[in-house]
Amino acid sequence: METVNIMIVGVGGQGSLLASKMLGHLLVNAGYDVKVSEVHGMSQRGGSVVTYVRFGDKVYSPIIDKGEADFIVSFELLEAARWIEYLKPSGRVVTNTQQMEPMPVIAGLAEYPENLVEKMRAKGVQVDAMDCLALAEEAGSAKAVNMVLMGRLSHYFPNIPLEAWHASLEANVPAKVVELNHKAFALGQKG
């Protein structure tokens, strides 16, 4: 199997690191060689958080270069656009449509770009966009955006049984919120 490259991007505090941990756990248990690498930047101050998850028969490096990502899983819309150059031509963006204003926008020095999904699609990018925040809140907590996105991502890996996704979820989230996260995952699957 060729190496599959997944970038998980978001803003600090959104749960992207838990999502990458769950994904890595899932893929190791599915029998793949897996490499995970995290880049935090100014994540504690609302800055970008990027995680690379690579899996296949044999993976030699945890880093994804520009033009190599099969998937960009984005917790925030501008982050999807910011990292788009890492997507390969046949790749896909799976993104939350939530918009979190970066500091230059908050300070009035810039405007949040409009119509980002349409702009990416106009460039030929395959974009699977949904309001993950609304679905997470429907499941019971805004903090479950990560599991909504993981549920949506599972749609693109039909060879990995849903039971394996759920087992990885249970192994990586606190017991008191497992049921809520299962609901969020299921809502993400439905899209």
Regions found by a protein language model. Give the residues of each.
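Active-site cofactor/cluster-binding pocket
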Residues: 1-191
